[in-house]
Amino acid sequence: MLTEIDHVAIAVNDLEGAITYYHDAFGAEVEHREVIEHDGVEEALLRVADSYVQLLHPIRDDSTVAKYLANKGEGLHHIGYRVDDCAAALERVKALGFRAIDDAPRPGSRGTTVAFLHPKDAFGTLIELVPE
């Protein structure tokens, strides 16, 4: 079901500062950058081997990332796991009685459809299912 780690997402107040940090400290380059209007965030993806560091910065005060930053401050927001079939993985988790944030896969970045699983059932970790 899980095939790889797609990304580790970090919520940041200063996207440009975070990009500069990862570039200067580790030589990481931005491979993809996108504003995801429906989530109220701007992302920058920096490749690390076969995965990404996803830097998330809110563009609206009502976004979940803005609320996260207000409540918890900057830091690890979620882990994205690659799956063969996002809809099937989501249905399996729900059939086992675990909570999901999304009822069905929804648009994500890079033209994908994704689904989030509730951190209360995942030992405090927000999980994103990302198709291969």
Residue ranges and their predicted role:
Residues 4-6, 28-38, 59-77, 92, ...:
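A cross-kingdom feature marking solvent-exposed beta-strand/loop segments within repeated
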Residues 50-53, 60-62, 86:
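Short, charged/polar surface micro-motifs in flexible loops or helix N-caps
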Residues 5, 12, 22, 46, ...:
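Short, structured motif recognition centered on aromatic/hydrophobic residues
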Residues 44-47, 54, 81, 90-132:
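Vicinal oxygen chelate
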Residues 16-29, 96:
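Amphipathic alpha-helical segments
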